[in-house]
């Protein structure tokens, strides 16, 4: 559910001494390309409120500060289409309208394409998603163009229906492994000379039990407990 709600909150960050406020409908348009050695390129988008870290880390003289999230290539444009189609809304739906909806009907409820071929044209014109692009393939793979039925009467909001659709594909099988990557870019001055430090972290899971997420969350706590 966290990734669905990530498209619900606005984002704030500092850029050249100016506070930038990105509304949630534009968050996934505001992404940059970031290369992680040995793992390729990722898309980075602003994540919620970066301004809170200025006081937390005593960075009162900092001119730019942005905290973000990295996703695989092709994620941001696809998720931007999902958000701006109203699929992450938490407001209550009309139960009768949603009864026996197909996955395609659900995705298309606000796009209002006349057919799946018409949808390809609209996605291209409105969201810059070509029918042969990785973004289109991501949407298709997730099941959003399927004729499978979802009983909308079981859910109260679009985000609940979306979660029910995505959970079939967005799970790890026995032999799947997850990946966590981190990227820090720090630009600073010493003796009026600008310098830059870039650091990377990448951790792979072993399987769908001993995941990269469990390592990064569990190991620091385990080390702390041992030290105490």
Where are these regions (language model features)?
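C-terminal catalytic/substrate-binding lobe primarily of soluble NAD(P)-dependent oxidoreductases
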Residues: 1-228
